[in-house]
């Protein structure tokens, strides 16, 4: 049985790499450090960092904390978090992913331009909560690109000028499907002659804020991280090239669920685990009991490479 470890499209994305590196540097310096929420959506990695001294706290504990160092993770935070930190004299180490920080700025500027902001994303995801905060908590959040949930579309004002953006880890096809469905929804509610929504650039937003250029009534900006989305096709091909796939990710990982489904669609013999203890040796065998020819080990943007290597070594040891 050949064990293939995917090093090209698995493991931490750049944003998470930065957060983990900063956390480790702080902890190595023996500086006490609190993390507002799980530093990454991978329980195994969180436990490793907690063993080094990281303390994970929730929103309530954060509001009660005083005079202490706090890490802002890659997902980012709403403005209210920073206001609380200043009021409580907290030393903030901000590791918000640069892609997310840019998206937060876009959401804030679109809101200032008077747009009704729509976020394609998951309402309870910390990144979306942060983005919405930068739009004064007024954004309409839509998870289902087919507009199948009436509760998601109920807050929409179809007479307002509107801007569509996205959580950075959502799927690209879904974003453009949502755009088309929103175009139809708004067209049917108002002007039947209205054309496609306008793609808005950073320069367009800047010119709009300065009053140098009028803004289109309905705009969209594809804010999905291409480093994340480019993994989709690569993992699809990786899953096809192996007899069996062991996908390693945390159960809380939104990106992990998306990538696992891609693997499973390409190869039905794809299995989701958090750590080696979840592995069923029967997955690695053919119907006649012989080992599969190859097993691929891959994971999410929140899965550390050391954990993928651990799983690969464990599987290799089963043949000895």
Swiss-Prot record:
List the pathway annotation: Isoprenoid biosynthesis; dimethylallyl diphosphate biosynthesis; dimethylallyl diphosphate from (2E)-4-hydroxy-3-methylbutenyl diphosphate: step 1/1; Isoprenoid biosynthesis; isopentenyl diphosphate biosynthesis via DXP pathway; isopentenyl diphosphate from 1-deoxy-D-xylulose 5-phosphate: step 6/6
Enumerate the Pfam families for this protein: LYTB
Tell me, what is one Gene Ontology molecular-function annotation carried by this entry?
Answer: metal ion binding
Q: How is the cofactor bound?
A: Binds 1 [4Fe-4S] cluster per subunit.
What are the EC numbers?
Answer: 1.17.7.4
This molecule's function is given as:
Catalyzes the conversion of 1-hydroxy-2-methyl-2-(E)-butenyl 4-diphosphate (HMBPP) into a mixture of isopentenyl diphosphate (IPP) and dimethylallyl diphosphate (DMAPP). Acts in the terminal step of the DOXP/MEP pathway for isoprenoid precursor biosynthesis.
Which HAMAP family did the record assign? IspH
PANTHER family reported in the protein's UniProt record? 4-HYDROXY-3-METHYLBUT-2-ENYL DIPHOSPHATE REDUCTASE (PTHR30426:SF0)
- Protein's name according to its UniProt entry: 4-hydroxy-3-methylbut-2-enyl diphosphate reductase
Top-down, what is the taxonomic lineage of the species of origin?
Bacteria, Pseudomonadati, Chlorobiota, Chlorobiia, Chlorobiales
């Amino acid at each position: 049985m050949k064990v293939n470890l995917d090093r090209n499209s698995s493991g931490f994305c750049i944003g998470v790499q930065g957060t983990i590196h900063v956390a480790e540097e702080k902890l190595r310096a023996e500086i006490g450090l609190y993390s507002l929420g799980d530093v990454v959506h991978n329980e195994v990695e969180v436990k490793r960092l907690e063993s080094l001294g990281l303390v994970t706290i929730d929103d309530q504990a954060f509001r009660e904390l005083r005079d202490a160092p706090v890490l802002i993770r890659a997902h980012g935070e709403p403005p209210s978090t920073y206001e609380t930190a200043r009021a409580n004299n907290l030393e903030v180490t901000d590791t918000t992913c640069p892609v997310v920080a840019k998206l937060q700025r876009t959401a804030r500027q679109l809101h200032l331009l008077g747009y009704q902001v729509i976020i394609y994303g998951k309402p309870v995801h910390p990144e979306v909560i942060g983005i919405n905060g930068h739009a004064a908590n007024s954004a309409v959040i839509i998870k289902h690109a087919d507009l199948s949930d009436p509760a998601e579309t109920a807050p929409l004002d179809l007479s307002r000028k509107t801007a569509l953006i996205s959580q950075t880890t959502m799927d690209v096809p879904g974003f453009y499907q949502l755009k088309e469905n929103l175009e139809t929804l708004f067209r049917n509610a108002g002007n039947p002659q209205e054309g496609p929504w306008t793609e808005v650039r950073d320069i367009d937003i800047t010119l709009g804020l300065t009053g140098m250029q009028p803004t289109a009534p309905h705009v969209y900006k594809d804010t999905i991280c291409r480093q994340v989305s480019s993994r989709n096709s690569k993992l699809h091909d990786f899953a096809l090239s192996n007899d069996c796939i062991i996908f390693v990710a945390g159960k809380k990982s939104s990106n992990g669920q998306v990538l696992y489904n891609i693997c499973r669609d390409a190869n039905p013999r794809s299995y989701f685990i958090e750590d080696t203890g979840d592995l069923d040796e029967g997955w690695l065998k053919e119907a006649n009991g012989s080992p599969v020819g190859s097993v691929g080990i891959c994971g999410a943007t929140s899965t550390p490479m050391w954990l993928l290597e651990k799983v690969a070594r464990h599987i290799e040891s089963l043949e000895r």
